[in-house]
Amino acid sequence: MSQQNGNADRVGAQGGMEHSFGFKAVDESEKQGLVNDVFHKVASKYDVMNDLMSAGMHRVWKDAMIAWLAPSKRPGWTSLDVAGGTGDIAFRIVEASGRQAHVTILDINGSMLGVGRERAIKKGLADNLEFVEASAEELPFEDASFDAYTISFGIRNVPHIDKALSEAYRVLKPGGRFLCLEFSEVELPVLDKVYDQWSFHAIPRIGKMITGDADSYSYLVESIRKFPKQQDFAAMIEKAGFERVSYRNFTGGIAALHSGWKL
């Protein structure tokens, strides 16, 4: 994308690690709190947010993610969905497994988890799910605990992406699968310009109309532009120890689905 700036974290002039909150440079200690505040504000309208960010395509991309994961229908198969508070991915996994899978939904934001719990009860899926409030950088699970690890539109908000990837590798069983769906770099020049106009001008305005909050939506757009390109993120996944790393672009690169295996 024309405003892509690569990885959000970089070494500053004083030798310390700088972090960004959207396009704004912030201290490492500030970032998580700022991100949490955004998601407290948008939790009740999270599906609306994703519809705005993707023009409704996130539903198609998530279905494709689950198809590529191909959850097992054998009893005892387990999956960890990180930053999955409202349950979109976890619900799909449970249904695709014939309601055999057990999915742990982990999110650092209690408001998001609250929405997920309510939705799970309404869908009759609560028995297949566990909700855990914790950080992606410090997963409260033993080594080799899960058959699959998923994260959808969440990893770009983690202050230390490398730590989250290392933790993903740690908690997966040998032979386990890592899948990450995230907004990415548009690779079609014409679509790039159109998407920039939509993202930076339309989304914050519509977000304000629907939720009364334009700033949160501006941050979410900016955070996409700060996220690593497809190839760079694939290299980070490999560095964490994963093998057979690959990715698929959706809608010209507006989103990308990365895959890796713990072998």
UniProtKB/Swiss-Prot annotation:
Annotated binding of S-adenosyl-L-methionine, by residue: T86, D107, S152
UniProt-listed InterPro entries: SAM-dependent_MTases_sf, UbiE/COQ5_MeTrFase, UbiE/COQ5_MeTrFase_CS
Gene3D superfamilies per the UniProt record, alphabetical: Vaccinia Virus protein VP39 (3.40.50.150)
SUPFAM superfamilies (UniProt xref): S-adenosyl-L-methionine-dependent methyltransferases
UniProt-listed Pfam families: Ubie_methyltran
Pathway: Quinol/quinone metabolism; menaquinone biosynthesis; menaquinol from 1,4-dihydroxy-2-naphthoate: step 2/2; Cofactor biosynthesis; ubiquinone biosynthesis
NCBIfam families: MenG_MenH_UbiE, PRK00216.1-3, PRK00216.1-5
Family: Belongs to the class I-like SAM-binding methyltransferase superfamily. MenG/UbiE family.
Protein role: Methyltransferase required for the conversion of demethylmenaquinol (DMKH2) to menaquinol (MKH2) and the conversion of 2-polyprenyl-6-methoxy-1,4-benzoquinol (DDMQH2) to 2-polyprenyl-3-methyl-6-methoxy-1,4-benzoquinol (DMQH2).
Name of protein: Ubiquinone/menaquinone biosynthesis C-methyltransferase UbiE
Organism: Brucella anthropi (strain ATCC 49188 / DSM 6882 / CCUG 24695 / JCM 21032 / LMG 3331 / NBRC 15819 / NCTC 12168 / Alc 37)
Gene name for this UniProt entry: ubiE
